[in-house]
Structure formats: C-alpha cells, structure tokens
C-alpha cells in the first residue's frame, strides 16, 4: 500500500485530482471501452472535485467516456433534497464537467425494493467491466462509505443502519439537528470497493489521525474498515501532515523517503 503525505489539504486535493486525470488520460477511454470511476461524497473529496473541474475546463481531461458509480446514498431523502448525495454530486461536480448524465450511477435511496436496487447496482458495475479506480474518504472511526465499524470486509452493496457517531457527524449538514439526519443508507460494501482495480483514499485533518494510524500500522480489522485496504494490490492513501499525528516516526519517514519523487502533484501530469 502506498502512502502519499502532502503538506496540507490543498496539495492533497491537487495530487488526488492529478492522479485521477492521469489515469483517465492513460486509459484513453472510448464509448465502447469507458473508464469506470467510483466516487465519494463528504468534505474530503471537495478539493479534488474543484481541481478536476479546472482540469476539465482547461482541456487536460475529459469525462465524456467516463462512467461513475457513487459509494452511497441516504434512504428516504428525496433526490432533490439539498443534502442528498444526488444533489451533492451534481452541485459540486457533475454539472461543471462534460460527463454524460446517462453515465452517472447513484444508488436510489427511494427505491420501492432497496435490496433489488443494491443487487442491480452490483450488476451494473459488473456489466461495464468493473471499477477501474475507486476514490474514497474515511470517517474518524475509519469507516469507508457507510461501512461502519463491525462491517464485514467482504460485504457487498446493501442497506446499512448509521451509527450515532455518524449521525452526529452528519448533523452539521442538517442544521445541527440529529433528528433530521436519515438513520439508514444504501452503500457499496467493503468487498465492492476492494473489487476495483485501484483504490485511492483521501485522509485529512487531526481528527482522522487515529484512523490513518490504524489503516497503515494496524492489523486488518472489521472495527476499522479502512484497514481492508491493506489487502488490495493497488491501494493508495493520500493524506496531509495533520492526519499523520499518530503515525510512528519511523513509518512517517519511511513513506516520505520512498515516495519523495512522487509527492509533487505536477509529477503526475506530464
């Protein structure tokens, strides 16, 4: 597993965006052979999305032959609700780039049969050849998507009950009222994410330091679902200095040394 340590959130976001753009360009996708991207919501990827929008406007990368699958969605929240992940993705990313609306896939949290919706989502990923690059962020408890602590590391797309910690954390988007936060979600599983050809996770801030320490130095453990990334042949974490607070000095120095030629975002797009 690679660990890319950037000085701050701005550089982390630029590195992630340039990495995504470089992967899409290298694949040279076509309508017949598109590039398939897994996408997260939340605060962690916002900077990356802004950078990708700029790269798209500059003509550096096109999303015309890119198919996307989002990680998760709340259950029971209307699609047009300002805090739905449909709204989040269109407001912060899709409406600003040249992606075809029919290539955007987001779980329907209002489906009559949620289990059928989850099974269909997995089938759609398989039908397009699987996800080439899955992007993600993590919570302070190390959860990826809505795979809360205790989730099976081989889990697939399914319905999940949110923990009180996650509900409290997400209440900042709902007028700080926990009663307005949906209590359930539909989410890709840990196994779904691990099926991708590559996985890139963004981790920023002191509040994620313990989760990053577990991800890099801890044992694979269902109570910290991010640790499953250790099992992936092409897993990358890009983080900022603040998130490294709990890493051993030796671990920090090791990754700084072996990645020293790859830390500049500009090195990715030549």
Curated annotation (Swiss-Prot):
GO BP: carbohydrate metabolic process; glucosamine catabolic process; N-acetylglucosamine catabolic process; N-acetylneuraminate catabolic process
GO molecular-function terms, A-Z: glucosamine-6-phosphate deaminase activity; identical protein binding
One GO CC annotation: cytoplasm
Record has Hydrolase as a keyword: yes
InterPro entries: Glc/Gal-6P_isomerase, Glucosamine6P_isomerase, Glucosamine6P_isomerase_CS, NagB/RpiA_transferase-like
Main EC class the enzyme belongs to: hydrolase
Reactions catalysed: alpha-D-glucosamine 6-phosphate + H2O = beta-D-fructose 6-phosphate + NH4(+)
Control of this protein's activity: Allosterically activated by N-acetylglucosamine 6-phosphate (GlcNAc6P).
Domain of life: Bacteria
Keywords assigned: Allosteric enzyme, Carbohydrate metabolism, Hydrolase
EC number: 3.5.99.6
Functional pathway: Amino-sugar metabolism; N-acetylneuraminate degradation; D-fructose 6-phosphate from N-acetylneuraminate: step 5/5
Presence of the UniProt keyword Hydrolase in the record: yes
Site (Part of the allosteric site): 151, 158, 160-161, 254
Active site location: 72 (proton acceptor), 141 (for ring-opening step), 143 (proton acceptor), 148 (for ring-opening step)
Transmembrane segments: none
PANTHER family listed in its UniProt record: GLUCOSAMINE-6-PHOSPHATE ISOMERASE
Cited function: Catalyzes the reversible isomerization-deamination of glucosamine 6-phosphate (GlcN6P) to form fructose 6-phosphate (Fru6P) and ammonium ion.
Family statement drawn from the similarity comment of this UniProt entry: Belongs to the glucosamine/galactosamine-6-phosphate isomerase family. NagB subfamily.
Protein's UniProt name: Glucosamine-6-phosphate deaminase
Organism: Parabacteroides distasonis (strain ATCC 8503 / DSM 20701 / CIP 104284 / JCM 5825 / NCTC 11152)
């Amino acid at each position: 597993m690679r660990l890319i340590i950037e000085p701050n959130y701005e550089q982390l976001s630029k590195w992630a965006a340039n990495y995504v753009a470089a992967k899409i360009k290298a694949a040279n996708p076509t309508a017949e052979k598109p590039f398939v991207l897994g996408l997260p919501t939340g605060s962690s990827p916002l900077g990356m999305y802004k950078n990708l929008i700029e790269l798209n406007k500059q003509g550096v990368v096109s999303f015309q032959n890119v198919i996307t699958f989002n990680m998760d969605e709340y259950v029971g929240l209307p699609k047009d609700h300002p805090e739905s992940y449909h709204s989040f993705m269109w407001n912060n990313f899709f409406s600003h780039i040249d992606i075809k609306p029919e290539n955007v896939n987001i779980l329907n949290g209002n489906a009559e049969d949620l289990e059928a919706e989850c099974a269909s989502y997995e089938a759609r990923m398989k039908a397009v050849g699987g996800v080439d690059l899955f992007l993600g962020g993590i919570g302070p408890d190390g959860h990826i998507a809505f795979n809360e602590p205790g989730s099976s590391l081989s889990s697939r797309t399914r319905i999940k009950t949110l923990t009180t910690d996650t509900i409290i954390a997400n209440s900042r988007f709902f007028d700080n009222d926990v009663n307005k936060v949906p209590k359930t979600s539909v989410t890709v599983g840990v196994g779904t994410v691990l099926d991708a050809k590559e996985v890139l996770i963004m981790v920023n801030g002191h509040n994620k330091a313990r989760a990053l320490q577990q991800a890099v130095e801890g044992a694979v453990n269902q109570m910290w679902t991010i640790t499953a990334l250790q099992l992936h042949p092409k897993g990358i974490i890009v983080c900022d200095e603040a998130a490294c607070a709990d890493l051993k000095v030796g671990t920090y120095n090791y990754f700084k040394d072996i990645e020293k030629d790859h830390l500049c975002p500009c090195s990715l797009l030549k």
